[in-house]
């Protein structure tokens, strides 16, 4: 009996150094910790907080997030995120009975037309927004389509939904916006709503709420709203809609 106890104790002592030799106490903890790639981890968290609407009203992204944001925007993840959001919008729409007055509302900038070509020249959001420079870029009318939104747009049209574009662009951009939309493949819409410069609203959220109220008064039924900003999606007069938030970690519009 003593010999057996001694044998068990010896086995335990021999096995002890081996047990846990490759074991991670916190297997879900990032290996980077606070090392050289910590900015990548931090910026992924920043991006998540922006999309979850926990970080708001930021004027610029953190300086250390320029490269991670660039990698995200130009990599596969941004396209995949956009695809997933648009797919969910289509799945939702395809389950509904479509009426003649049913509309989907889309934003324009970085919702249907990509402004990434502008932001890649301005630090992916690390520079404060310059309205003059941005207007010059818009006036060129060369913004490409966001491909996953274009796919969804065509699918929604095929289901029988009417499309309304609702943007904070001013009315003086109507001609260039119409031309750019058509050039990018968005050929059909029920209404294109741009902002009257004489209309005073405290922010984009209030403006878009007011425009949705006008649409409801015209007899439309708002089924879905798709945008890259929370101000596209929140507020009053959303009708019966579900909202779908597209990714945009570069800037915030209140």
UniProtKB/Swiss-Prot annotation:
Known SUPFAM superfamilies for this protein? HAD-like
Q: Name one GO molecular function term.
A: nutrient reservoir activity
Annotated S-S bridges: none
From which residue to which does any coiled coil extend?
none
**Pfam family, any one:** Acid_phosphat_B
Q: Which UniProt keywords apply?
A: Glycoprotein, Seed storage protein, Signal, Storage protein
Signal peptide positions are 1-20
Q: Which residues form the propeptide?
A: 21-35
Q: In which tissues is it expressed?
A: Accumulates in the stems of developing soybean seedlings.
Role? May function as somatic storage protein during early seedling development.
Family named by the database record: Belongs to the APS1/VSP family.
Q: What is the name of the protein in this document? A: Stem 31 kDa glycoprotein
Organism of this sequence: Glycine max
